[in-house]
Regions:
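Extreme N-terminal, non-catalytic leader segments
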Residues: 1-12
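P-loop (Walker A) phosphate-binding loop of NTP-binding proteins
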Residues: 17
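Conserved lysine of the Walker
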Residues: 22
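Hydrophobic positions on the alpha1 helix immediately C-terminal to the Walker A/P-loop
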Residues: 25
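Small-molecule kinase domains that catalyze NTP-dependent phosphoryl transfer to phosphate-bearing small molecules
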Residues: 92, 114, 144-179
Length: 179
């Protein structure tokens, strides 16, 4: 509330691993404040971007360049966002949906605090989660084959990003949703 009272526009990043509660917290803030929420999961790489070199980069499995150009820069400038979600089923980008910048704007998702994106936020929050609780939540919300992708591929990508770029320590707040 203090930030929105002091500024005409506030951008908040909610960062953390899979199943840590990022989307839930984003939805809660949206319900309380009526603010837009933008999801890093909507910015996975298109097939032609999925190269060995790109995946070798910590945080390289999201299209942060497109996220910066299509979401963060317009929000910072107070312009509407032409939000184009990546469809994981078809590997295509959906037609744009125009979203007006709010006083409070939430970005939720792993990779939201990549150094290319972090300077655009006024506040950043990290949600830690234990490996046990993460596994329990992923198994509860996903089919076995999809859960296996999390354990074998996505969580190792996230962990490498968190470690290589010291993400947790670069966030302003750490809120445990691991209860």
């Amino acid at each position: 509330d203090r930030l929105t009272a002091e500024r005409s526009r506030v951008l908040v990043a909610i960062e953390g691993g899979s199943a840590s509660g990022k989307t839930t917290l984003g939805e809660l803030l949206q319900n309380v404040y009526g603010c837009p929420v933008f999801h890093m999961d909507d910015f996975f790489l298109r097939p032609e971007q999925r190269t060995e070199a790109r995946f070798a980069q910590p945080g390289g499995n999201v299209d942060r360049e497109r996220f910066l150009e299509e979401v963060l820069i317009p929000l910072r400038e107070g312009r509407p966002v032409d939000y184009r979600r990546f469809d994981c089923a078809t590997f295509t980008i959906a037609p744009p949906q125009r979203i007006k910048a709010g006083t409070l704007n939430i970005v939720e998702g792993a990779y939201s605090m990549h150094p290319d994106l972090a300077p655009y936020y006024d506040l950043s929050v990290f949600l830690p989660i234990s490996a046990e609780k993460q596994r329990e939540r992923i198994l509860k919300r996903n089919a076995p084959a999809h859960a296996k992708q999390f354990f074998d591929r996505w969580i190792p990508f996230e962990q490498r990003y968190f470690d290589a770029l010291d993400v947790r320590n670069r966030c302003d707040l750490i809120l445990s949703a691991d209860g």
